[in-house]
């Protein structure tokens, strides 16, 4: 059946089409009252009202702007550009990261690059510019990308899960169990219940206490990038710290070379007094390069082992907590395969519809009995929110 479009026409909106020979009444002509009863008056056009949530019932002003889902997002995140970009609630440390990178590289391009390009080679500022733009690109992608947040269970899904657990059907409240077990590559993995998101967390998922979200393949919350590091932005985070270590080491070596060349034939202390900007770069790079190199090496080990920081700290697949060491079910037993799986796999789509509109409350067509549930819930697989 083809789709048809319907249009509501008011009974008094337009006259019926007249025959070709009929005479049209003039604009000032008025109907003459006949002997019969008067025709009924045309009904008034319907009045539409909207409530704050966008529904068709209730009081509200006409044409109120519907809210998008990022405006009512339950986590502690901040959104920009109409929900296209997101950041953690506390961005002070992230601003400090931007300040340190921009200040150090800015001073290097202004006070060191001209001298080194003139005395040595023009390749020095070119290499520094390439590293700088790559570092900034990876940092912004890490900070403003959804790390893999799982949407919280709706009221219907949470109620259906509690009813599924309580098989007796009694009205007494019984809290859901804290764990479930699933088999992954021959290894039993526990799924913990999140009382905030009202669902069993998928494997490798953890609830971030800072952002108040469940994040897939949760690695850690990094205040330096202002975001959680998870399944969807870990590759950008790893590329950021790795490229930042190269940029820091490159600037440190170039500044030392600059000061050494300037100090030839003169006092080294007087050279330091003449170039205070280079001294500031040297201090910043010296105190930051060790932590950046150490962090890059640690995450290289995690990538090669297909582990997360959260799993390594908790000792999930080792004997750090005094228990028996178990095999990592997510490892492919090959360093190259693990690196490709973590860094080169397809980027999964975001599961939170930030740009979508908040759906209005639907009116049920028939009354609901007290012994029936108020809504239908999705199957348990969808409530888990991810694949093993």
UniProtKB/Swiss-Prot annotation:
<dbReference type="GO" id="GO:0019706">
    <property type="term" value="F:protein-cysteine S-palmitoyltransferase activity"/>
</dbReference>
<feature type="modified residue" description="Phosphoserine">
    <location>
        <position position="19"/>
    </location>
</feature>
<feature type="transmembrane region" description="Helical">
    <location>
        <begin position="120"/>
        <end position="140"/>
    </location>
</feature>
<feature type="region of interest" description="Disordered">
    <location>
        <begin position="364"/>
        <end position="388"/>
    </location>
</feature>
<dbReference type="GO" id="GO:0018345">
    <property type="term" value="P:protein palmitoylation"/>
</dbReference>
<dbReference type="InterPro" id="IPR001594">
    <property type="entry name" value="Palmitoyltrfase_DHHC"/>
</dbReference>
<feature type="transmembrane region" description="Helical">
    <location>
        <begin position="91"/>
        <end position="111"/>
    </location>
</feature>
<keyword id="KW-1133">Transmembrane helix</keyword>
<keyword id="KW-0333">Golgi apparatus</keyword>
<keyword id="KW-0564">Palmitate</keyword>
<comment type="similarity">
    <text>Belongs to the DHHC palmitoyltransferase family. ERF2/ZDHHC9 subfamily.</text>
</comment>
<dbReference type="GO" id="GO:0045087">
    <property type="term" value="P:innate immune response"/>
</dbReference>
<feature type="compositionally biased region" description="Low complexity">
    <location>
        <begin position="10"/>
        <end position="27"/>
    </location>
</feature>
<feature type="topological domain" description="Cytoplasmic">
    <location>
        <begin position="141"/>
        <end position="235"/>
    </location>
</feature>
<dbReference type="GO" id="GO:0005783">
    <property type="term" value="C:endoplasmic reticulum"/>
</dbReference>
<comment type="function">
    <text>Palmitoyltransferase that catalyzes the addition of palmitate onto various protein substrates, such as CGAS, HRAS and LCK. Acts as a negative regulator of the cGAS-STING pathway be mediating palmitoylation and inactivation of CGAS. May also have a palmitoyltransferase activity toward the beta-2 adrenergic receptor/ADRB2 and therefore regulate G protein-coupled receptor signaling.</text>
</comment>
<keyword id="KW-0812">Transmembrane</keyword>
<keyword id="KW-0399">Innate immunity</keyword>
<feature type="region of interest" description="Disordered">
    <location>
        <begin position="1"/>
        <end position="67"/>
    </location>
</feature>
<keyword id="KW-0597">Phosphoprotein</keyword>
<feature type="domain" description="DHHC">
    <location>
        <begin position="192"/>
        <end position="242"/>
    </location>
</feature>
<keyword id="KW-0449">Lipoprotein</keyword>
<feature type="topological domain" description="Lumenal">
    <location>
        <begin position="257"/>
        <end position="277"/>
    </location>
</feature>
<dbReference type="GO" id="GO:0006612">
    <property type="term" value="P:protein targeting to membrane"/>
</dbReference>
<dbReference type="GO" id="GO:0000139">
    <property type="term" value="C:Golgi membrane"/>
</dbReference>
<dbReference type="InterPro" id="IPR039859">
    <property type="entry name" value="PFA4/ZDH16/20/ERF2-like"/>
</dbReference>
<dbReference type="GO" id="GO:0045824">
    <property type="term" value="P:negative regulation of innate immune response"/>
</dbReference>
<dbReference type="Pfam" id="PF01529">
    <property type="entry name" value="DHHC"/>
</dbReference>
<keyword id="KW-0012">Acyltransferase</keyword>
<dbReference type="GO" id="GO:0160049">
    <property type="term" value="P:negative regulation of cGAS/STING signaling pathway"/>
</dbReference>
<keyword id="KW-0472">Membrane</keyword>
<dbReference type="GO" id="GO:0018230">
    <property type="term" value="P:peptidyl-L-cysteine S-palmitoylation"/>
</dbReference>
<keyword id="KW-0391">Immunity</keyword>
<feature type="topological domain" description="Lumenal">
    <location>
        <begin position="112"/>
        <end position="119"/>
    </location>
</feature>
<dbReference type="GO" id="GO:0005794">
    <property type="term" value="C:Golgi apparatus"/>
</dbReference>
<feature type="transmembrane region" description="Helical">
    <location>
        <begin position="278"/>
        <end position="298"/>
    </location>
</feature>
<dbReference type="GO" id="GO:0016409">
    <property type="term" value="F:palmitoyltransferase activity"/>
</dbReference>
<feature type="compositionally biased region" description="Basic and acidic residues">
    <location>
        <begin position="369"/>
        <end position="379"/>
    </location>
</feature>
<feature type="active site" description="S-palmitoyl cysteine intermediate">
    <location>
        <position position="222"/>
    </location>
</feature>
<feature type="topological domain" description="Cytoplasmic">
    <location>
        <begin position="1"/>
        <end position="90"/>
    </location>
</feature>
<feature type="topological domain" description="Cytoplasmic">
    <location>
        <begin position="299"/>
        <end position="388"/>
    </location>
</feature>
<feature type="compositionally biased region" description="Pro residues">
    <location>
        <begin position="28"/>
        <end position="46"/>
    </location>
</feature>
């Amino acid at each position: 059946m083809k789709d048809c479009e319907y249009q509501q026409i008011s009974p008094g909106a337009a006259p019926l089409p007249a025959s070709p020979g009929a005479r049209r009444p003039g604009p000032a002509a008025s109907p003459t009252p006949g002997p019969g009863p008067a025709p009924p008056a045309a009904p008034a056009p319907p009045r539409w009202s909207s409530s704050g949530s966008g529904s068709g019932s209730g009081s509200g002003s006409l044409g109120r702007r519907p809210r998008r889902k990022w405006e009512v997002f339950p986590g502690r995140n901040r959104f920009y550009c109409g929900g296209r970009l997101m950041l953690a609630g506390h961005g002070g440390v992230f601003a400090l990261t931007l300040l340190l990178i921009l200040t150090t590289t800015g001073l290097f391009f202004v006070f060191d690059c001209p001298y080194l390009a003139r005395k040595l080679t023009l390749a020095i500022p070119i290499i520094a510019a390439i590293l700088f733009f790559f570092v900034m690109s990876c940092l912004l992608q890490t900070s403003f990308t959804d790390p893999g947040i799982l949407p919280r269970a709706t009221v219907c899904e949470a109620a259906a899960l509690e009813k599924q657990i309580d098989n007796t059907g009694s009205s007494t409240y019984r809290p859901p169990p804290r764990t479930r077990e699933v088999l992954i590559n021959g290894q039993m993995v526990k799924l913990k219940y999140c009382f905030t998101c009202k669902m069993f967390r998928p494997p490798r998922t953890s609830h971030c206490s800072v952002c108040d979200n469940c994040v897939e393949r949760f690695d850690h919350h990094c205040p330096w990038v202002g975001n959680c590091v998870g399944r969807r932005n870990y590759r950008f985070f790893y590329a950021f710290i790795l490229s930042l270590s190269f940029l820091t080491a490159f600037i440190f070596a170039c500044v030392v070379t600059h000061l050494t060349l300037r100090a030839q034939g003169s006092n080294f202390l007087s050279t330091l007094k003449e170039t205070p900007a280079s001294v500031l770069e040297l201090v910043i790079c010296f105190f930051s390069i060790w932590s950046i190199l150490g962090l890059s090496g640690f995450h290289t080990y995690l990538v090669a082992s297909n582990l997360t920081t959260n799993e390594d700290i908790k000792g999930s697949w080792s004997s750090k907590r005094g228990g028996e060491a178990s095999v990592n079910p997510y490892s492919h037993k090959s360093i190259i395969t693990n690196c490709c799986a973590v860094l080169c796999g397809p980027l999964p789509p975001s599961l939170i519809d930030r740009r979508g509109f908040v759906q209005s409350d639907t009116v049920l067509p028939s009354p609901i009995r007290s012994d029936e549930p108020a809504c239908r819930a999705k199957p348990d697989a969808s409530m888990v929110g991810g694949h093993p």
